[in-house]
């Protein structure tokens, strides 16, 4: 499977299961072992100052981290429900045009801890980080705590 096909499949999944991602124009640029990169256009996310609305920027960061964790756990053969428990975003500069949310893969030791806890308890928590970038510049930094919970028998994702 090519990376482009995989990114298209991930994008389809997000648009189908998290419809706001389609309304915001979110595109999946990459989803691989190094992380997830989402891209969002200015137009559907614009505010009264002709820059990206802070809530849109935050939503794209939340989505990038969620996608990274979801597909990492899927690759490990885990069916889960993921919720965000808390998050913080620091805006460093206005976002005047299309932007990207870059969520790196979990470090190996964090992933091992997450998987061990999940297998033992049926739930686990981890911190995810995302950088928002515009024209090569980091414009915001996001941190969020996500909780993965094992699906109940018969429950679908």
Residue ranges and their predicted role:
Residues 1-13:
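Polybasic, low-complexity association/targeting segments
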Residues 21-23, 33, 64, 82-86, ...:
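Short connector loops at helix/strand junctions that flank enzyme active sites
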Residues 22-26, 85-90, 113-115:
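Short structured motifs
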Residues 23-52:
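Catalytic strand-loop segment that frames the active site of acyl-thioester-processing enzymes
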Residues 38, 85-87, 101, 126-128, ...:
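Hydrophobic residues positioned within well-ordered beta-strands of beta-sheet architectures
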Residues 55-76:
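Active-site helix/loop of acyl-thioester processing domains in fatty-acid/polyketide metabolism
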Residues 69-108:
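Hydrophobic beta-strand-centered segment that forms part of the acyl-chain substrate-binding groove
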Residues 95-96, 106-157:
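HotDog/MaoC-like acyl-thioester-processing domains
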């Amino acid at each position: 499977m090519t990376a482009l096909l995989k990114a298209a499949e991930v994008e389809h999944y997000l648009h189908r299961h998290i419809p706001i991602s389609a309304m915001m124009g979110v595109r999946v640029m990459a989803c691989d072992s190094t992380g997830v990169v989402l891209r969002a256009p200015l137009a559907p996310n614009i505010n009264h100052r002709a820059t990206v609305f802070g809530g849109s920027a935050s939503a794209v960061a939340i989505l990038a981290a969620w996608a990274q964790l979801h597909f990492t756990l899927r690759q490990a053969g885990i069916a889960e429900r993921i919720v965000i428990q808390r998050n913080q975003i620091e805006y460093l500069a206005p976002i005047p045009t299309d932007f990207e949310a870059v969520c790196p893969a979990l470090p190996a030791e964090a992933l091992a801890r997450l998987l061990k806890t999940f297998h033992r308890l049926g739930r686990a928590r981890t911190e995810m980080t995302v950088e928002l970038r515009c024209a090569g510049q980091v414009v915001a930094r996001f941190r969020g705590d996500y909780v993965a919970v094992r699906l109940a028998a018969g429950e679908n994702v």
